[in-house]
Amino acid sequence: MFGYVTICEPELKMKDLRKYKAYYCGLCRKLKEDYGTMGQMTLTDDMTFAIILLSSLYEAKNRMNQHRCKVHPVKKQAMIENEITQYAADMNVLLAYYHMKDDWADEKKVSGLLGGGLLKKKAEKIAEQYPRQSKAIRESLQELSDCEKENSQEIDRSAGCFGRLMADLFVYKEDMWEQTLRRMGFFLGKYIYIMDAYEDLEEDLRKQCYNPLKRLHERADYEEQIRQILCMMIAECSAEFEKLPCLLDVDILRNILYDGVWNRYNKIQKKKLEEGNKKNEQESL
């Protein structure tokens, strides 16, 4: 359910692209250092966005280093780390753990059992350190599980579960920016959930799996409705972002919010157009 909140590379200046990659590689290294290969496998662009956002807002002191890794064994890569990197790594692992645990409980996925088992002890320590975030993740995933069992087609209800989860993860400190960050995370979380459901719909229909968009899909204006909902979520999220006094890396953040979040949507539209053209060609033969 991740990977939607990323950069639009063609629209990003080279210096900003290098810096984004340095934040991303810094998170990857922190996950490997603290949680091993399994932790590293939880790496997402979405949490990289959270690092850049919170680092900009709280003016975190960045540490720039150069390191090699398995992906780049020859040339050293620039890596940025700060106090937010640690927080994002912890949240990444905590969310992955509860998600794997939920996968095993609901669908008996072996990957959930094995992955959750490997992360269990470390995730429990993180949960003790961050009880508010841990509670939010558990409760949100439980409600999402309930939505699936009930085959709920209330999009706002199911998306709201993930929205509340992300809202709590975005709140690094309970201070004057808490409510703005909470609203920003809420709408971004809803966007991620709906985008994921939209991307998975065809497969879910074939496999008869739960998807909150099945009823909406029956409408003639389904595509237009989805685009309007997604636009609304990102518009609300971006409006909250603009209330924050972020100056550092603001061009990267705006690139993600105004362009990058649409990468996967645009790919889906391109694929649907190509499939439609191919079908028309076959019918005309």
What do the PLM-derived regions correspond to, one by one?
Residues 1-183, 190, 194-231, 239-252, ...:
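Acidic catalytic motifs of isoprenoid enzymes
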